[in-house]
Amino acid sequence: MAKLLLFLLPAILGLLVPRSAVALGTNYLLSGQTLDREGHLKNGDFDLVMQDDCNLVLYNGNWQSNTANKGRDCKLTLTDYGELVIKNGDGSTVWRSRAQSVKGNYAAVVHPDGRLVVFGPSVFKIDPWVPGLNSLRFRNIPFTNNLLFSGQVLYGDGRLTAKSHQLVMQGDCNLVLYGGKYGWQSNTHGNGEHCFLRLNHKGELIIKDDDFKTIWSSSSSSKHGDYVLILRDDGFAVIYGPAIWETSPQAKEKMIGMVTAGKL
């Protein structure tokens, strides 16, 4: 289980990764990827479904695209401009989020608080598949979740995991990505005590020690907003942001066209 440092100082409080939080299946969609008919994205009790009736529904999040019976064999895609698009089987557009940004790599994430949020473009990437000074040998580490949002903190062997890949904020102050062919590390072993990792609201990963001295930074500072670090199933650890679109709960009476009743 990820161990998380709970700070009393408001300046660094933020959202903490729950100890029991474990991703239930895939919880993100990347630019160029497709969520097929009856496909799911899940995070805890929240389930985004591209339904057979062409309606995109976020169960327990009180949101839907209101496109029931407006197409057949519909699919959801995320474009290189951060826009979510539902297309009919004949290729025609049924619905779009209408939230375009600059061209880049984006991620649509089922947030643990029950929202679907589009982050991007990507501002930083850790690649464990290429050799270099930051390479290391793989070893087995216990499993936990794969997302870190702005304001969240990992410390003392707290970790993100995706399949056999593990991103660990080790107790020796070294940030290590186990997996891939070569792995990756921040090369900060022994550089501080009681170190913690935090993703700030400018898309920058920062390691600080117990004196709040900066030990390491991703140097990926961008404009202010909400960001997410995703440890992807392919082993890449990528920061996306800021958030450019998100769902908002709809009134119960507007939640129509559901295939599965009683889940909201």
From Swiss-Prot:
It comes from the Eukaryota. It is found in: Secreted. Forms heterotetramer of 2 chains 1 and 2 chains 2 arranged as a dimer of chain 1 and chain 2 heterodimers. Its main location: secreted. Residues 1-23 form the signal peptide. Disulfide bonds join C54-C74, C173-C195. May be used as a potent insecticidal agent against hemipteran insects. Keywords: Disulfide bond, Hemagglutinin, Lectin, Magnesium, Mannose-binding, Metal-binding, Repeat, Secreted, Signal. It comes from Colocasia esculenta (Wild taro). One of its GO terms (biological process) is response to other organism. One of its GO terms (cellular component) is extracellular region. Mannose-specific lectin. Shows agglutinating activity towards erythrocytes from rabbit. Has insecticidal activity against cotton aphids and other hemipteran insects. A motif (Carbohydrate-binding motif 2) lies at residues 170-178. GO terms for molecular function: D-mannose binding; metal ion binding. Beta-D-mannose binds at residues 51-55, 59, 63-64, 170-174, 178, 182-185. PROSITE patterns: BULB_LECTIN. The keyword Glycoprotein does not apply. InterPro entries: Bulb-type_lectin_dom (IPR001480), Bulb-type_lectin_dom_sf (IPR036426). This is Mannose-specific lectin CEA. Residues 26-131, 145-252 form the Bulb-type lectin domain. A motif (Carbohydrate-binding motif 1) lies at residues 51-59.
